[in-house]
């Protein structure tokens, strides 16, 4: 099995695992937020019980009670909700490494944005993600973090700043994905470093016969609320790499900033409903209005048009594909079968921007995406979709020979 196929399957496996664990984490998070907001007081509740809720699901009835601090005695069987968050982050980081670190030349670095080495780009990636958690956590623990509204405003400003910063360093696709990873790291670290440790302190106090302090529950609640409001934007950012209209624009950082506001207003609506309040009307017009602005921004032309043509300087890994046997013939195949969609101005009906932001207008671009051309059009029939441009088997075989010839040139 060649390396490109192996890496693609590892990417698929990591993505599958990440989606499964993400569903588990988000599902439990949404459930407990709804449960917490839906708790009701009752005169016959035991001392220390904050509220209760009756639920029905799958033909069975459930009676749930919440202790504001902790029960008088610790039950023998206690279920922890933490592994979903840990496994979601770990699988996400593995996926980030496979796609954007192993494939840094292809997906992470864009010389037209910032011409840096792949090694430096990876260092910036890891460092910025770690920085996000450290900065956020320090602010939460400071006096500044005692005011929840003020803290949320700070968090939003931090996210907007990172959105802009990432778009100045990475490709548009990588920038939005990294903003999602940056935010998701804050969320999962909240579980690992704040929520679970404070719960363990409460349990230790119970075992020692001490009365747990309410502040430990308050810390966990604050971080849990933050996670609740950040979930929907993270999902958007993780999906954005499939939609060039979101990332292939100079206004991508503004789009990301507006998405965070959309997530807040949508979650506010559902939180209000779960709390038994009157259904607020304003969140949906606000969310729709924000989304209309996002759609408009995706089509706005650049404010400053670039005068210089895109650099055609070839990186070493690109040059090997350009000088490999059959490149001229492959270029003709790509031009005839792929360029009607993969272009700055696609001519195929219904295509307004190059799929996934991938363009095949220059030798450099073809060489840059050689592995994707090989996998999608050479080794499989994924591209062109439904073979709408009638790519022939001989042309697919030509792509395979060209790709393998390029690899053979660098083999020891």
Identify the residue ranges that each predicted region occupies:
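Alpha-helical transmembrane segments
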Residues: 131-137, 191-194, 261-271, 294-300
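Membrane-interfacial entry segments at the cytosolic side of transmembrane helices
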Residues: 145-153, 248-252, 274-288
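Cytosolic juxtamembrane amphipathic/interface segments immediately preceding
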Residues: 3-7, 63-81, 213-217
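Membrane-interface amphipathic/juxtamembrane segments adjacent to transmembrane helices
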Residues: 29-72
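Aromatic- and Gly/Pro-enriched helix-to-coil junctions and flexible linker segments
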Residues: 73, 80, 93, 100, ...
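Hydrophobic alpha-helical membrane-embedded segments
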Residues: 15-45, 182-198
């Amino acid at each position: 099995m060649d390396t490109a196929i192996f890496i693609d399957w590892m990417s698929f496996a990591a993505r599958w695992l990440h989606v499964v664990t993400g569903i588990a984490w988000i599902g439990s998070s949404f459930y407990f937020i709804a449960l917490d907001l839906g708790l009701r007081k009752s005169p016959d509740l035991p001392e220390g019980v904050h509220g209760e809720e009756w639920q029905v699901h799958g033909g069975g009835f459930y009676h749930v009670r919440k202790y504001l601090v902790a029960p008088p005695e610790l039950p023998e069987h206690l279920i922890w909700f933490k592994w979903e968050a840990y496994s979601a982050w770990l699988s996400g980081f593995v996926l980030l490494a496979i796609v954007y670190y192993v494939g840094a030349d292809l997906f992470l670095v864009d010389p037209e944005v910032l011409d840096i080495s792949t090694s430096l780009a990876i260092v910036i990636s890891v460092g910025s993600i770690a920085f996000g958690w450290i900065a956020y956590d320090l602010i939460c623990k400071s006096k500044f973090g005692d005011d929840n509204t003020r803290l949320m405003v700070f968090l939003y400003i931090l996210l907007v700043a990172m959105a802009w910063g990432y778009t100045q360093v990475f490709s548009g696709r990588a920038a939005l994905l990294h903003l999602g990873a940056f935010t998701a790291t804050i969320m999962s670290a909240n579980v690992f470093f704040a929520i679970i440790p404070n719960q363990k302190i409460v349990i230790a106090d119970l075992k020692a016969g001490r009365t747990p302090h309410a502040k430990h529950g308050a810390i966990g609640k604050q971080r849990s609320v933050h996670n609740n409001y950040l979930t929907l934007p993270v999902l958007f950012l993780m999906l954005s790499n499939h939609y060039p209209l979101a990332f292939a624009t100079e206004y991508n950082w503004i789009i990301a900033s507006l998405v965070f506001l959309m997530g807040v207003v949508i979650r506010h609506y559902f939180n209000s409903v779960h709390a038994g309040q009157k259904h607020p009307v304003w969140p949906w017009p606000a969310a729709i209005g924000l989304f209309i602005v996002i759609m408009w921004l995706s089509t706005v032309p650049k404010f400053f048009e670039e005068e210089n043509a895109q650099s055609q300087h070839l990186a070493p890994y690109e040059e090997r594909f350009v000088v490999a046997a059959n490149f001229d013939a492959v270029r003709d195949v790509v031009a005839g079968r792929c360029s009607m969609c993969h272009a700055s101005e696609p001519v195929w009906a219904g295509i307004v921007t190059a799929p996934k932001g991938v363009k095949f207008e220059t030798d450099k671009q073809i060489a840059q995406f050689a592995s994707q051309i090989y996998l999608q059009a050479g080794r499989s029939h994924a591209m062109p979709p439904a073979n709408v441009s009638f790519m022939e088997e001989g042309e697919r075989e030509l792509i395979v020979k060209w790709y393998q010839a390029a690899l053979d040139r660098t083999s020891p």
